[in-house]
Amino acid sequence: NLNGKITFNINSLKGIKFFDGAKIDLKVINGKLILSNSTLTSYKIGKMFFTDSVLESVDNKKIFKSKILFKISNQKKFYQKLLISRPYRIKLNNVYFEIEKDLNNNEVEIKKIILNKKIVDNSSNKSIDLSNLIDVNEIKELKNWIELKKYSNQIFFKISKLN
C-alpha cells in the first residue's frame, strides 16, 4: 500500500468559468485518495471548501464522495454570474452540498443541498434545505454553462415563492 501527501497550488484554471484558482490537498492512505481541505477559489465570488472528500473503490467502481461548502463573499457577483433576476435573490452566505459521483458511468447523486447552512449559531439568515426541491435527473441533463444558469434561475424563483 502507498501512503503520502502532496499539495498543488494552482493560480490559474483554464476552461473553468466559475473558478480562478485552486489548492488541491491530496492524501493517499491505504489506497484511498483523500481530498479534504482542498479549495476552489473565485476571486470575485467566493471560495469552495471540500471536507470529508474521498475517492475510493467500492465493488470495482470508482466513487467520489464529498461534503462541500461554498462560502460566498460577493453575493452581487454570484447572482450576476448565474444571471439570477433581482426579485429571486435572497441573502446568501453559503451553499452546502453533499455529493456522490460514480466515475465509471458519470452518475452524480446529490445527497443534500442547503443554502445558508449554519456554521456558527449566530447567523441570522434562514437555512433552506433544497434537497427535496431539486430533481437530480434535471441536473444530469444540463449540458453547458447556459443551461446551468437557466436552471439556477428556476431554483431561485422557486425559493422566492417559498419565502
Language-model features: where?
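Small-residue helix/turn framework positions
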Residues: 1-162
